[in-house]
Amino acid sequence: MNKRAKSKNREPLRKSPVKRGDEVVVITGSERGKRGKVLKVLRNTHKVIVEGIKMVKKAVRPSQDNPKGGIVEKEATIAISNVMLASKWEKRQEKKKVAVEKKEQG
């Protein structure tokens, strides 16, 4: 079974931990640690589009809006499980700092 068929069998998200406009941090992958604002939540595919993260180059055909066409850079989707709310991320980092300080003292 290929990846596309697998993702289509999932049920759409009923409740999402992140909403459009939220500040999120990427927690895994090549963009790990980067922050951005959620532009769109794709509930059916369990993915999000985050501003300035995972930029890809896309060939665009000439149209009335863009008579020249060419190559455009835009955001690609990221699995919703690979992002975390920035506020939650900061709390987690604070806990780690406290644990390290206690370990160094004792």
From Swiss-Prot:
Residues 1-20 are annotated as: Disordered. Residues 8-20 have a biased composition (Basic and acidic residues). InterPro entries: KOW, Rib_uL2_dom2, Ribosomal_uL24, Ribosomal_uL24_CS, Ribosomal_uL24_KOW, Translation_prot_SH3-like_sf. The keyword Ribonucleoprotein applies. PROSITE patterns: RIBOSOMAL_L24. The keyword RNA-binding applies. SUPFAM superfamilies: Translation proteins SH3-like domain. Keywords: Ribonucleoprotein, Ribosomal protein, RNA-binding, rRNA-binding. It comes from the Bacteria. It holds the Pfam family KOW. GO terms for cellular component: ribonucleoprotein complex; ribosome. One of its GO terms (biological process) is translation. GO terms for molecular function: rRNA binding; structural constituent of ribosome. Part of the 50S ribosomal subunit. One of two assembly initiator proteins, it binds directly to the 5'-end of the 23S rRNA, where it nucleates assembly of the 50S subunit. Belongs to the universal ribosomal protein uL24 family. This is Large ribosomal subunit protein uL24. The gene is rplX.
